[in-house]
């Protein structure tokens, strides 16, 4: 099963989501978007995790403000994406992530994996939602939410040269939450895992993906092949 469908959050809001469900899947993964919407890159991540055997969806979190948002990785895209992220706000976005988790829970254990804006939402999900694992890639607001306590096993990926997230903040997150697995990728920049960005680092992206799959499996979120 592949395609778009409508999710309904607990406040009645309806939003689009892109979904791929391989036959026989026994675990779910929610891919939480960057500030660029559910664009081709995010859909490719859904496809990639589904290829590993996970029932995978990406909810369109900007639907609360504007439908069908797919932004480019350029100056105007960044500016518009930041405006949309600020307009959505954390609480409504978390309602939509929760709807995605609930949708997948009939399949089995569910993990959330977020990128940039979504990385910070993955951090919040670890403390607020019934997820088996949470993974955040370069979540720029995690440090500002450092007082939140993850209840689910949590893995965080950061780039050493991320212009938006100083290493001092990364170290403070790691020190404040010693149970959280934190990895810093040498010479990697913000967005290093996205092959549509100039900052893409293939080696760091591959290592982070491998670590993510191992982390999910260690916490009971397994693909079909596992």
What are these regions (language model features)?
Residues 1-226:
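N-terminal cap/leader regions of alpha/beta-hydrolase-fold enzymes
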């Amino acid at each position: 099963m592949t395609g778009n469908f409508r999710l309904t959050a607990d406040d009645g809001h309806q939003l689009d989501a892109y979904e791929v469900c391989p036959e026989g899947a026994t675990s779910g993964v929610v891919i939480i978007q960057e500030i660029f919407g559910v664009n081709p890159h995010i859909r490719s991540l859904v496809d990639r995790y589904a290829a590993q055997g996970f029932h995978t969806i990406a909810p369109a979190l900007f639907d609360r403000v504007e439908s069908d948002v797919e932004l480019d990785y350029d100056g105007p895209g960044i500016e518009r994406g930041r405006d949309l992220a600020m307009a959505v706000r954390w609480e409504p976005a978390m309602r939509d992530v929760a709807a995605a988790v609930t949708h997948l829970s009939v399949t089995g254990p569910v993990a959330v994996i977020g990128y940039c804006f979504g990385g910070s939402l993955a951090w919040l999900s670890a403390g607020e939602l019934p997820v088996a694992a949470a993974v955040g890639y370069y979540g720029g607001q995690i440090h500002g939410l450092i007082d939140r306590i993850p209840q689910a096993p949590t893995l965080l990926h950061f780039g050493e040269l991320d212009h938006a997230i100083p290493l001092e903040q990364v170290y403070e997150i790691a020190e404040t939450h010693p149970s959280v697995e934190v990895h810093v990728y040498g010479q990697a920049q913000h967005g290093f895992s996205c092959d549509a960005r100039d900052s893409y680092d293939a080696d760091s992206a591959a290592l982070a993906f491998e670590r993510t799959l191992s982390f999910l499996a260690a916490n009971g979120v397994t693909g079909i092949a596992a």
